[in-house]
Amino acid sequence: MNTESVVEFLGNVTLLQRLPSSSLKRISEVVVFKGYDRGDYVVRENQNVDGVYFLLQGQAQVLRSAGEENYQEFPLKRYDFFGHGIFGDVYSADVVAVTELTCLLLMSDHRALLEIKSVSDSDKERCLVEDILYLEPLDLNVYRGFTPPNAPTYGKVYGGQLVGQALAAASKTVETMKIVHNFHCYFLLVGDINIPIIYDVNRLRDGNNFATRSVDARQKGKTIFTLFASFQKKQQGFIHQESTMPHTPAPETLLPREEMLERLVTEPLLPRDYRNQVATEISVPFPIDIRFCEPNRSTKQNKSPPRLKYWFRAKGKLSDDDQALHRCVVAFASDLIFATISLNPHRREGMSVAALSLDHSMWFHRPVRADDWLLFVIVSPTATESRGFATGKMFNRKGELVVSLTQEAVLREAVTIKPSFGAKL
């Protein structure tokens, strides 16, 4: 049995579905194959625990002494598991093979591999965006997310945080060989940065090649955000690409967003109110390095085309190569500057506008690295009835189209949106 087959098997074990693929690969490298004939004891009651057993083939039975008052038998089959129990370092029951049986044994020395740390479980130091995406497991399909003190907030939970955390929660419930290829989400209520967010995952479908999940994000008992995601096992098929990456300066030649904003703050030709607003933006940390392709001297008081191009990548190297992690980070970054470009043709001096994301969709076409440069090309084809619509394409440095996106936002003039736990509309 090759490593890939072992990883695929482990990805179907409920206990392990909350772990990233890197953990499953490491577990597959250290598990021991154990074979038993019918009637053999796998473990004996009061025997010292030697690890966690995963049933690969065949069936087994859990037996307690027949003389006990509450004598019970529990059948075990493929994907079931057992190990440490309430009695600590000894097994609490006999486990007997009722057919020819094959188990994978994760020795106690490697039990730390079962611990959950984040989307990635690497022991390396995590960068800020990984800390933001960290989820605490509460139950099999329930996770708790937080808004760290150094996370971008803008007075409320940043929309990309909801997207990234919800997608991370969904990814933890899918076997590791299936990777998200698209998702659609809706922003329902403003999130409160001062309280945790509960992510409840619903397993809608698990097929041979595809899996579907829905996720509801809740605060104070109310659903503030919902996401539907589809996952697919890697397959061979037709390949073509019509979209061409536009010519742009290399990201290394462009100013980081923070440095560009610093220059705008001290530019005397710009309106004072605008410079004060920029100063506020600088104070908000953002874990993504952004480089705008065109000189951005807009005061948000002048009309401009509804288009934008910028390079982006995570600040710092991500601790893992797991595609689940990288796609969650790209999803996190995608909400910062997107449908708001629909405002560009309508700006004028003194105009006050509020913009809030309504829905957001992404399609992943090819593997991505969120800690390497990606070009985000955005166009807004229309705005109507207080809604702006934008489409986006993301290219890697090879010119490959890796992600397609759409977003719609509500755009309102002369409305002040106060941070609150209320409806977004």
Swiss-Prot record:
GO function terms (MF aspect): fatty acyl-CoA hydrolase activity; long-chain fatty acyl-CoA hydrolase activity; medium-chain fatty acyl-CoA hydrolase activity
Top-level enzyme category: hydrolase
Gene Ontology cellular-component terms listed: peroxisomal matrix
Biological or metabolic pathway of the protein: Lipid metabolism; fatty acid metabolism
Annotated EC: 3.1.2.20
Tagged with keyword Protein transport: no
Keywords attached to this entry: Fatty acid metabolism, Hydrolase, Lipid metabolism, Peroxisome
One family name in Pfam for this protein: 4HBT_3C
Family of this protein: Belongs to the C/M/P thioester hydrolase family.
Protein's job: Catalyzes the hydrolysis of acyl-CoAs into free fatty acids and coenzyme A (CoASH), regulating their respective intracellular levels. Active with both medium chain and long chain acyl-CoAs as substrates.
Protein name (record): Acyl-CoA hydrolase 1
Organism for this UniProt entry: Arabidopsis thaliana (Mouse-ear cress)
